[in-house]
Amino acid sequence: TTNFGTCNPGAVCPSGMMRVVPGDVRRSDQNKYDKDSRWWSTPYEFHNVFFTGYSHVNLSGVGCPDLGSLLVMPTVADTLCVDFRQYGSAYTAEQARPGYYANTLTRYGVKTEVTATPRCAVHRYTFPGGRSHILLNLGEGLTNETGATLRRTAPNEVVGSKLLGTFCYDARQAVFPIYFVMRVERKGLAAGYWKFQRPKKGVEAEWDPDDNKYKLYTRYAKELSGDDIGAWFSFDAAAGEQVEVRLGVSFVSIEGARRNLEAELSGKTFDQVRAEAEGKWNEDLSRILVEGGTEEEKTVFYTALYHLLLHPNILQDTDGRYPLMEGDGIGTVPAGHNRYTVFSLWDTYRNVHQLLSLVYP
């Protein structure tokens, strides 16, 4: 998580498509490292302090930026703010375990917790009370691509897609969408969109109160597209109120993301999902039992084994459908099988694939 290791804490299952990571590398003079001021390929850096939301579907240990999008952020303020440079917060009280991550946003007094299934994320926010907001930012991310689409399908739900790709800046045509369904598990929500309005000149700039600013859409609820857009949900929270956010993804379709959400999260609480994720990690990490050595040496070993099992990732939805490479086709894996992606051959050919074949065939 530091010294350019590009590893991250966060919530993920072994080989999971979904990986929820705290984001603290976006444009703040409070941070030591900034993703837009240097070569940077990870959503998190241990020494940084300015948190701007949780990103979904992330890479680990890579040398080029991609993915790291769909940023979700809780805030508390009388006036809604959707500019990440202004709504970000310092954070403290980090906790990280396999399948779970938590921190406390010091600016807002909000405790944030995240856990994951193979294809979905569950957030749990504990609010101090007062006017509270949950933001979905589609304009920011580690990807080198821009462009996203949103549509509100229920008072507490938005669906859409975001373009990803152009890994390492040179694979210019290697782009693809990620689809999502996000629900805020609370009634009595005000909701809307935002979009950054490009600057105008002359009288147009004088007449437009949203010129070169984020425009809030409080009544429009149809489809919205753009490079720097997002969705907001606002409500009056009671002191200590907990609100869950559930987000499912798919590389096939919005319908696939919805099926994943229903199949993996229906009827389950945050704590149940967390326990299942921890159980998956215990099962896979226990494939190798270490005898002897110090506790520190065991910690180093199992941390390395944990990192081994982050990639490759499953690519197919719960119905077996997945996108074919270098085309628009959709494939289907046989029942009981997985389709994997993020196979790296850069140095991993030395020992990673042999170990996976022997211990996790």
PLM-predicted stretches and their roles:
Residues 1-361:
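Accessory carbohydrate-recognition regions in carbohydrate-active enzymes
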